[in-house]
Amino acid sequence: GIILNDINRAYSGEKLEVEEYTSYDLALDNRDALASDAYKNAENYYKSVFENAGGSINFYPDKSGAAPTAEMYHRETSEFSVQDVKAFCKKHGITENVFFISAFGITLGKYNFRKDAVFTTIYHGRNDSRLSDTVGMLVKTLPVYCDFSGSTADCLNAVQQQLINSMNNDIYPFSQISHEFNIKADAMVIYQGDNFAFDNIGGEYAQEEPVQLNAAKAPVSISISIERNKFVFEIEYRGDMYNEETIKYLADNLETTADGILREYEPADIRLMFEEETKM
C-alpha cells in the first residue's frame, strides 16, 4: 500500500514527496463532473448493460438466524497453481482479475440455474494517473454482468471489456446504479492478488494481524489473494444466513469452475458438484 511504502521510505531516510493531487481535489473535480456530459454518458452506459439484466442474484441462504453475525472461511487452492492462472491469462490476453470475476459469475449463475449472473466487485478507483500516489478512500463498488451462455472465450472477453468501460464511467455512483437497476452487494468477489503482501516495516519483520469482524460486507464476499505462491480464498459471510459447510461447498465449486476454465472447458461443460448430483 501507499502508506506502507512511504513509511519504509521514511525509515530509509528518503525525502517524501507532497501529494500533488489530493482526494479533496478529486472531490472537487467529481462535483464539476456531475453537471457535465460525462455523467449523462456514464448513466447511459450503465443503462445499456444493466437495464434488462434483471437485477443482482445471490447464493440462497440455508438458515435464518436471530441476529446478523460475521464469519470467515479460509481456503488455499489445491486444484491449480498461480503459474497455471498467470499462463492462461497471458495466453488469452486477460487479467487475473477478469479470470476470477468470470469464474465467480459462472459459479453464481449455475447456483441459480441460469446462464448469466449480476453481482458486484470493487476496484481501486485510481483510473487517473494523478491518483497513483494519492491517499484516500478511492475504492468503488462496480456491478458486473457475466453472460456465459456462449463460449468461455466470449465470456472472459466480454467481462474484461465491461470492466474497462465501467471503470471509465465510474463517475456514476453505485448508490444510483443500485436504485435504478436493483443491484445489491449481496454477492461480491474481490481479486487482491499480491498487492497487500508485505513482511517488513522499516527493515524489521512485520506480520499482518487479522481483525475480528463485527459485520460482514455482504451476505457472501470472496476475496482472492496470493500468499506463499498459492491462491487463497477468504470468504466472509453472514453466519446467520449460511452454515460453514455451505461456504466450504461454495469454495469447492468455485475451484471447480476455475479449474474448468483453465482446462479450456466451455461453461456448459463445467459441472459443479450439485449438477453432478442432479445428473445422476
Regions found by a protein language model. Name each.
Residues 1-33, 54-60, 87, 91, ...:
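Acyl-group handoff/entry surfaces in thioester-processing enzymes
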Residues 1-8, 115-122, 149-155, 173-174, ...:
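Extended, hydrophobic beta-loop-alpha segments that form or line the acyl/peptidyl-thioester binding
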Residues 2, 6, 95-107, 141, ...:
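Short amphipathic alpha-helical face segments that pack within enzyme cores
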Residues 6-14, 48-56, 144-145, 162-169, ...:
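Phosphate/oxyanion-binding loops and surfaces in catalytic or ligand/nucleic-acid-binding neighborhoods
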Residues 9-10, 22-73, 279-280:
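Short amphipathic alpha-helices and their capping loops
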Residues 33-43, 70-71, 89-97, 101, ...:
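His-Asp-centered acyl/peptidyl-transfer active-site segments
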Residues 70-82:
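DNA breakage-rejoining catalytic core of tyrosine-based enzymes
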Residues 192, 255, 273-280:
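N-lobe entry segment of adenylate-forming
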